[in-house]
Amino acid sequence: MSTYPLRDAVAAIATPLADALGIALWGIEIIDGGRMVLRVYVDAKPGMPVPADTAEATESATPEGVALEGSTPEGVTIDQCARLSRQLGLALDVEDVVRDAYVLEVSSPGLERPFFEIAQVVPYVGRTIELTLAVPHPEWPGRRKFRADIVRVEGDTLTFLPDTAPRPDEDPAPISVAWDDVKKAHLIHVFPDTTRPQPGGKTGQRKKAQPKKPARGGAPHDDTTD
């Protein structure tokens, strides 16, 4: 079974199981190299309160061929991930969806969530993403990978502002591409600056070592070169 039919088959089983647990299927990644990895991402349903027991953790599921990644910073509990992992693993085995040996991973999308549909990008307009195009963009010969800010989403078209320009003498300009031309994309999480300001409004900085005053009649001595 090729990647796309397999992904659709796994999604058809995972979607109602996730819904019964009060969570939503976010997307599925299939890594086919050696032993196949089925990576299932689940998220809290829109409008649902964030559970009190969310935490980052990793737990191995009990069924053979099933591994769980229970990182849950987005509102999905570890218990929900574990239960879905067990139920989905058993269902895939009963239905014989995957013929070869595989590893099943169930987790939340995390802070740098991947995007599987263009509708998932809409709430993150203005944020920074990393995306890879299926083919190089005409204005960027040979380049497919970009770090950029999301400008807007219109229908099936994504517009983004790259952090660099094609030529050094130009400023970055927005690029619009069809979502079908995006091979993969994920959010870039920017951690806030926690540097404490010093008196006078300046942030703390390490002072550069100053050369010692020479002894009378001697040459200057700089400890930083020893």
From Swiss-Prot:
Signal peptide: none annotated. Belongs to the RimP family. One of its GO terms (cellular component) is cytosol. InterPro entries: Ribosome_maturation_RimP, RimP_C, RimP_C_sf, RimP_N, RimP_N_sf. It comes from Nitratidesulfovibrio vulgaris (strain DSM 19637 / Miyazaki F) (Desulfovibrio vulgaris). Keywords: Cytoplasm, Ribosome biogenesis. Required for maturation of 30S ribosomal subunits. Residues 190-226 are annotated as: Disordered. Pfam families: RimP_N. Coiled coil: none annotated. One of its GO terms (biological process) is translation. Residues 204-215 have a biased composition (Basic residues). SUPFAM superfamilies: YhbC-like, C-terminal domain (SSF74942), YhbC-like, N-terminal domain (SSF75420). This is Ribosome maturation factor RimP. It is found in: Cytoplasm.
